[in-house]
Amino acid sequence: MQGGRIGRPFRILVSTVNRTIESALRFVNLTAAGLLAGSLGFGKAALVPGWTDELPRHDGEPTPVAGYFNAIGPVALGTAVTLAIGASRGVPVRRLLDSAAAVGLAGVLAATIMVTVPINQELEAQPATDYPSDHSQTLVKNWARAHAVRTTLGIASFVCAVAASNIRNHAK
């Protein structure tokens, strides 16, 4: 090291390690975001924290793998934020797509935790009736809207993550 400068071999090693870490983060991000988008679009319960509260369990037993599923949303969000902040500065569009994916995944988690789970808990607390009240119908409509928003955000985030991972660095 001369005059505070990093030598060329070390710079190549750091670049390779950063690309390797970025590739691993992109793999984890794509996997988690894809599972999350799939669970939102096609499943009965979204794989985000609170999903066990969305569908009641009649036997009272906790879901044995709920801990693993609860981690999918936060892992997708964490890797998206890490990629948006720490990814290489090669292509600006990639950083923009990583940022959009992170914002979308944050929206999915926020809509789930702050809207759909409280609505489900309120609906569960209501006594069974022959005809639904106006209030419960309003809650169901609000839940459907929030679910549509979080599904759209989840799928859009996955599309952004796929697009960001397919952008190649251009040779200078």
Residue spans for each PLM region:
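N-terminal amphipathic/basic-hydrophobic helices that include classical n-h-c signal peptides
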Residues: 1-15
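Glycine-rich, hydrophobic membrane-spanning regions of integral membrane proteins that mediate transport
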Residues: 11-20, 53-61, 89
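A generic hydrophobic-segment detector
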Residues: 124-172
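Acidic/histidine-rich alpha-helical segments that form the ligand environment
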Residues: 99-115, 119-128, 140, 144
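A periodicity- and composition-biased signal for non-globular, repetitive helical segments
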Residues: 8-11, 50, 156
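Hydrophobic alpha-helical topogenic segments used for membrane insertion/localization
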Residues: 21-44, 68-88, 94-114, 149-166
